[in-house]
């Protein structure tokens, strides 16, 4: 079964080159990708994820707001009755990883994460969610 991924930029971060590269590599790995574009809110991401019936949400975070915005996306999904897992890629300091996981983020990809590692991790996250 093809994995469906929604990728989004939440908040005011206008840098989209990285998320477009990630979207392409996920497509090349056989995943179906929905890109919501820039300047999304946790609410719009959650609604789109549910409407698109995706298996996982990927957030690109470069603005330093990851400890605020990523948990808000997770909370909004849960409030809407969805258990879609959320993964985050971008600039996330190592000392924030535990807080991200505690907030319900399933995986975090920092600078230098390889395409193979991202694909393998997303496959694993989705496999756990489908089990």
Where are these regions (language model features)?
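N-terminal pre-triad scaffold of radical SAM enzymes
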Residues: 8-12
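Cofactor-cradling patches in redox/metallo enzymes
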Residues: 19-123, 127-128
